């Protein structure tokens, strides 16, 4: 059983338990209506299913924090149903269900170090590095002088994900991507 905290102390990226289901807080908002009691609106991702749900709590409520073990592991491979990660300290392999990693899966590359969350020894989800460098494998060609950064085009990166990039990005360029938002940050020198 986790520690209970006042709902007003909730923070982004905290792990909470709602109806015995583990969630990661994506966003929250304190609302004080003109009439009636203040409340907190919480958007949270179910760590087992990957679904994002919105909850509303009275400002007087308390919520239970989930207590997960966090381990650094390296991504190995997928069989379509599970994603497999290697704990480099114990050489144990852990399988995370694909449905729990819908967003994260598109930015995983072989050997990438991630944080795996374990609930009583069972993996329930991962956290990618905030920023990661990827190679562009497919995009429309850029032209010399295309330096306007407010116009974007789609580019496919080595993992198969598509990211919107400035016009000057070409196939073979390496780019830094915000893995949480799936957005381009900058071009990286080779």
Curated annotation (Swiss-Prot):
Quick one: a GO cellular component term?
Answer: cytoplasm
Localization per record: Cytoplasm
Associated pathway: Protein biosynthesis; polypeptide chain elongation
Keyword Cell membrane recorded:
no
The protein's predominant localisation is cytoplasm
Q: Which PROSITE patterns match?
A: EFP
This protein's name = Elongation factor P
Organism listed in the record: Sulfurihydrogenibium sp. (strain YO3AOP1)
Q: Which gene encodes it?
A: efp
